[in-house]
Amino acid sequence: MSCYEINGEMLLIDCGVLFPEDDHPGVDLLLPGLDYLDDEKLAKVKALVLTHGHEDHIGAVPYLLKRRPDIPIYGSKLTLALVEAKLREHRIRGYKLNVVHEGDVAEVGEQFDLEFIAVNHSIPDALAVCVRTDAGTLINTGDFKMDQLPLDGRITDLRAFARLGEEGVDLFMVDSTNAEVPGFVKSETEIEPAIERVFEKANKKLIVACFASHVHRVQQVLNMAVRHNRKVCYVGRSMVRNMAVAQELGYLHVPDNTVIELRELDHYRDNEVVIVSTGSQGEPLSALARIANREHRDIEVGEGDTVLLASSLIPGNENAVYRVINGLTKLGATVVHKGNALVHVSGHAAAGELLYAYNIVRPRAVMPIHGEVRHLVANADLAKATGVDEKNVVLVEDGGVIDLVDGVPRVVGKIDASYILVDGSGVGELTEDTLTDRRILGEEGFLSVVTAVDTRSAIVVSRPAIQARGFAEDDSVFAEITDQIVTELENAMKGGMDDAHRLQQVVRRTIGRWVARSLRRRPMIVPVVVKI
């Protein structure tokens, strides 16, 4: 999410989520740092612009609108349809959705004039946005690439970018995801032969896993299914929802009697159906992960079946994806993925496309966006290679504050942009301390020590009972430390210590040192001292 503020008015562009990695145990979603938008700032927001319908750009919209549901939202027809489905799931009412098309202009408040530009991406109806203000003109590309043969025929509008460049662009905010990749991204049309070969070789069950928003990929699978006389069955709540929306709006063309419901699956032989599933990133609760773990109640995979992972591997998801691949392989399935076949192309511009964009726009200044630090740096180098002055290439991480004055951007500060963690029904209640506790529990184990003392007599009346979880060693290994705990407690009480909390710290310190020295572990320790 990016935030633009001028003369007491604010504009937001995109409002997405991230999915947790292994260092966020138990976390469901990571929201952008919405804490910056306190009630006073939230009242200044004149609009939220959504560039496209991927989760990392729209996923946090319901959480924002729970605080202020009447924020006007601008986006393409498909993007807003996907957002509306989310808002209904969250039971949010009173929202204001404004459908825009490429070439449209909109005045937002008194400070922002918007123009929308068609861009090509891995989801239909993506838009870039030009924002004109008294401080200067900027373009935010959103996610884009320059596929010259897109499946839907909708190319990135290079003439619009060139025209805006002629008018003068002060700040060009450009997708950096593939800035390290040389050349141009392959066209979506080039993967069709590989998908065809998968269908030709699959003589039993066939499962295709892809992003639930990848309408183009699902369209290719539908076309291939018709050609090979297979029905199509969507599996996964988000897949079913998104494809229904795409079909209703005309973005997905489904021949009659092609799609069947999950409950109808048993009525067909394995070689008469292709299952289109969520879970291409190994998400633990996704349909594909449950199939790989033999936990799906309706679908099983066995010897001779085929699974096609028609997606890229998002950094950070490697372990989860390979666990699913290994699980499917162990069950006897043949797994086809990007590592062994051309079954996916990226939706983000590679270095050659970025250079082309810089040369036709010729911006005064550039701010790389989207991606890790190395991607931002690579994109910055591309901008400088096309002649953008080095001092006008702005590199910032999340929370960076930029001032655009008379068309010149400068980094002037940083705000706290810490992620808000969603844990079940709790939003923002999970703290870093709790996450640390979870990591310790998962990596180092847990020890509880319960004992009773008589502080007046300075004696331990009940020997410490130690319970361990997450240790390879048997509980009997802790027998040698109990005598030391008793000694340390009685010495502390003889010295006048009679507070239960302080005595618990004695226990924690004593067993903690012993475990670190003897077992090379630093577990979570919960001591309980009962005074009698």
Region annotations inferred by a language model:
Residues 1-49, 54-268, 286-300, 319-323:
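His/Asp/Glu-rich metal-coordinating catalytic cores
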Residues 111, 126-128, 444-448, 461, ...:
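Broad gene-expression machinery/nucleic-acid interaction feature
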Residues 496-532:
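C-terminal tails and terminal domains of large nucleic-acid-associated
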Residues 180-310, 314-497, 504, 509:
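Hard-cation-handling environments
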Residues 87, 383, 515:
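Conserved hydrophobic residues forming the short capping helix/wall of the S-adenosyl-L-methionine
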